[in-house]
Amino acid sequence: MTAPLPLDTRKLLLLTLAVLVVWFANLDYRKLIKPDEGRYAEISREMVASGDWLTPRLNGIKYLEKPPLHYWAGAAAFTLFGQDEWAARLWSALTGVLGIALAYYAGRSVFGASAGLYAAVVLGSCLLYVVVGHLNTLDMGLTLFLFVSLCAFMLAQRDEGSARENAVWMHTAWAAMAGAVLTKGLVGLVIPGATLVIYTLIQRDWRLWQRLRPITGLLLFLVITAPWFIIVSMRNPEFAWFFFVHEHLLRYTTTIHQRVEPWYYFLPLLIVGWLPWTA
C-alpha cells in the first residue's frame, strides 16, 4: 500500500488545489470593469493587432503613462489563449498565485514549514489580495515583484546561506526591482529602497549596504530595464519628460493628477482589505 502523505504535505497539496481553483476557474465570470480593466485589455489587444510591442497605444493614441510589462503579458495571453476576459486577467492571477507560493517558501525557509503554510493561507485568503488577483490592473504584478525583491533581500541575509546563495538572492532582488519598474515605474525602486533605509536605521547594520552587490546588481537592473526606456525614448522624443516628470515628479509633488486624498486614505482600505484577519 502507498504510505499516507505527511500531514504538512497533504495540507500543502490541498491549499495548492484550492488556490488554483479559486484563482483560475472563474476569471471570466464577469465583464471587464471600466475604466482600468478595459483600458489595459485594449492596450494589449492593440499591441497584438498592430504588431508594435514597443509603444503602448489606447484607441490608436500613444499611452506612455506606464511601462509595458503588464501590457506585454496581456498581449502574450491574447496571442496564446484568445481575446477574452479570462486571458485579460491571466497575468494578475498568475502573479497572485506566485505571491502565495513565495509567502510559503520564504516563511518556510526562515521560520519553518508551519510558518510558511500559515503565511500562504493568510495571504491567499485576504479579501483585497483575492480581489486584486482577479482584476486586470497593474497592482498584482507590481505587488509580486516588490514581494520578490523584499523576500530575496531577506533570504540573502541568512547566516546559514553560503556566499554564492546569498549572492544569487541579492541579484534576484535587483532583478525583481527591475520587473517592478517595468510594471509601474520608479515606485518599483523607491519602495524597496525606502524599506532598506528604514531597516538599516532600525538594525544599525551599515555593512548591509556592502552586501547589496551594488555594482553587479545595478548592472543587472539596467540590463533588464534600460533597453525599453532607451528605445521608446528614441522612437518617442516626448516620452522622457512625460514619463519621468509629468507622471512621477509632478504626480507626487503637486495636485496636477487630482490626488488630494488625506494621508490616512489607505488605512481603512487596509483594514477592510485584510479581512477576515482584521475582524
Where are the language model's segments positioned?
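Membrane-integral, polyisoprenol-dependent glycosyltransferases
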Residues: 2-279
